[in-house]
Amino acid sequence: MESVEKKDSLTAPSEFATTASTDAANAPTTFPVEAPPLEEEEVIIEQDPGFVSEDDEDRSVPTEDKKQDQDNAEANEEQVGRGDERHGDYLDVGDDVLLKHLQRQCAIICDALQERSDVPLAIADVSLAYERHLFSPRVPPKRQENGTCEPNPRLNFYPVFAVPEVLATYHIFFQNCKIPLSCRANRSRADKQLALRQGAVIPDIASLNEVPKIFEGLGRDEKRAANALQQENSENESHSGVLVELEGDNARLAVLKRSIEVTHFAYPALNLPPKVMSTVMSELIVRRAQPLERDANLQEQTEEGLPAVGDEQLARWLQTREPADLEERRKLMMAAVLVTVELECMQRFFADPEMQRKLEETLHYTFRQGYVRQACKISNVELCNLVSYLGILHENRLGQNVLHSTLKGEARRDYVRDCVYLFLCYTWQTAMGVWQQCLEECNLKELQKLLKQNLKDLWTAFNERSVAAHLADIIFPERLLKTLQQGLPDFTSQSMLQNFRNFILERSGILPATCCALPSDFVPIKYRECPPPLWGHCYLLQLANYLAYHSDIMEDVSGDGLLECHCRCNLCTPHRSLVCNSQLLNESQIIGTFELQGPSPDEKSAAPGLKLTPGLWTSAYLRKFVPEDYHAHEIRFYEDQSRPPNAELTACVITQGHILGQLQAINKARQEFLLRKGRGVYLDPQSGEELNPIPPPPQPYQQQPRALASQDGTQKEAAAAAATHGRGGILGQSGRGGFGRGGGGHDGRLGEPRRGSFRGRRGVRRNTVTLGRIPLAGAPEIGNRFQHGYNLRSSGAAGTARSPTQP
């Protein structure tokens, strides 16, 4: 038993256990044997008789019975073999392959439980250890040559459409609030108010001093729909939900408001890390109360629950003892800590020009827009399949990035705006999660020291914005800001954003399958119509609208030809646009057409050469960025400007124009040579047209003999007359129906030859056959695939035949 216990493991059943169970099931007869009594200390684990080891079998069964059992087993195997021949199962070859799945899963669970000293008994503990082992391993996954992580087969055993709790360290938190009546869904003109034109600037944040009054009503401009549904059991005819049917609602909102009745919504949490906010509140506003211990003295005086700054100290700092002034300063400080500092940190994180460029580049991948679409087309590699999380790159071919192109007008703008809004929420939550996880107790103590040193400056600042700016300098230092900006944002797909959207709606009690709600529908579009706890969402919605217009993904401006991947944003036009940058267009046309080889340093080794491959060009094309013509904080499209670009338009790899021109001339000359001297038909790779069509064969010069020329007029008259009698009516036709077998000349006179005059002159006969040849309908003009020039379709009188060569 001891040897068996050491040999077995938790990963899979042993080999002899599997075969023993199979043999026991297939054995036709069994013989009772009296096994010797086992000692008590040896009987530790009650074991299934189907999994008895071979050593125990040898010790317990006598030798004579053992031989008989062996003979029976051999006979049984022969019988089973004959049965398998009749009823074969390809899964029984060798070991049972159906056990491999169980073995692999046991191995994964065993590896996940190695870090624990005891085996967990609760399902929640096993799931937590399993998720940590899969999604938060101590050893990061290996990086492949293409930059992505190696495939992880352990993920095959995790539920496909389940959201792992280990990953959702910050994304699972929500802010459950009452939906304001002034939300975007109750503003029928919201799409027009959010429309941005040339010259629009990036949105700014606000403070409670700047917005003293907040209106959360429906407004005078909005009118209820005449056919709005009314509740039957309501005396005042009021709608129980927040969403109101309006006259100007689009089709999506009209259906939404009749489908659901909601009053509250789970907004994604945008708060600063709880560790930071708890420290700030305790040092600036009110002392945090600690939980009471059993041996604590209740009579002992503590500062828990008291203001961080007393009235006496605040009066000395402000040099006034007016209670109204002191109360106003406390309100200002509370607003700055709870609302404005969060907006200040958001603006510093998102409004940075470098960060905005990275955001818009990620959106180009998410929506397969502009230069990313052009790179995918030339490289023949779907770059939009790349997604990342916390700097780890993955390739996911199941995500979609083009479904927004099926929408038009306001429906497309609402969807794109909501996707960008969710993308910003997702990015900010990821940053806050990293910030929260990195903080240790020593960092929080150092933060307390900094807050105490700047306590007077914070309380005596000029206004709310200055307090928030000073506080942001302390809690959100430049080093932390740059570190988060370098690692974010992550590459996302529209499928990931759709899963995030469904996750939010489900937490809000809205079933996504029965309605067409968007999380941005429940966010107000203006600060003066939004409660202060939701100002962070209002800012992200305005910023999402600006980024969507600045990235030119609101409308589809692409076309045919060179305009297939056209985008007006500053990332694409003019430097990455094949329409505006002629040097870039010329370089893209010579990809894979040349190879430059320099002199070799020695005779044995070959010299390094330059070959413009699609991969090399795409890498340089994706890296190409000109900051001089990128206007981050203003919508300034190149097409709407009369001035030339600030930087010179150049190619990606070959930046010298004369070299590029020489390579293009060489390539053009080679193509022309192939068109002239090459064999076969060359087709244009874009349009499919023939580049070297074979010209039609020249018509031979028709020189009639004098004898025939003199008879030309008589021939035409005779042809018309002969046609009515069933005889041939033009050159080359037999004169059937003439006078005797020898008749049937051109004019029907006796004694003339049947096929033209002068029987011995072959040239005239050849000219007669060649006259009026046209190619077959639908056949190429090559070879001798011609027919005689007779129009067989009825035109005019029936039974007449006219040559196309005749007028």
UniProtKB/Swiss-Prot annotation:
Keywords: Chaperone, Eukaryotic host gene expression shutoff by virus, Eukaryotic host translation shutoff by virus, Host cytoplasm, Host gene expression shutoff by virus, Host-virus interaction, Inhibition of eukaryotic host translation factors by virus, Late protein, Methylation, Phosphoprotein, RNA-binding, Translational shunt, Transport. Residues 280-345 are annotated as: Binding to host EIF4G. Residues 16-29 have a biased composition (Polar residues). The keyword Ribosomal protein does not apply. Residues 348-466 form the RRM domain. Its main location: host cell. GO terms for biological process: intracellular transport of viral protein in host cell; symbiont-mediated suppression of host gene expression; symbiont-mediated suppression of host translation initiation; viral translational shunt. Residues 756-765 have a biased composition (Basic residues). It is found in: Host cytoplasm. It holds the Pfam family Adeno_100. Residues 1-88, 684-807 are annotated as: Disordered. Residues 726-743 have a biased composition (Gly residues). Might be cleaved by the viral protease. Phosphorylated. Tyrosine phosphorylation enhances preferential binding to tripartite leader mRNAs and allows ribosome shunting. All late proteins expressed from the major late promoter are produced by alternative splicing and alternative polyadenylation of the same gene giving rise to non-overlapping ORFs. A leader sequence is present in the N-terminus of all these mRNAs and is recognized by the viral shutoff protein to provide expression although conventional translation via ribosome scanning from the cap has been shut off in the host cell. Belongs to the adenoviridae shutoff protein family. Protein that inhibits host translation while promoting late viral translation by ribosome shunting. Blocks host cap-dependent translation by binding to eIF4G, displacing MKNK1 from cap initiation complexes and preventing EIF4E phosphorylation. Binds to the tripartite leader sequence of viral late mRNAs and recruits host eIF4G, PABPC1/poly-A binding protein and 40S ribosomes subunits on viral mRNAs, allowing ribosome shunting and efficient translation of late viral mRNAs even though conventional translation via ribosome scanning from the cap has been shut off in the host cell. This is Shutoff protein.
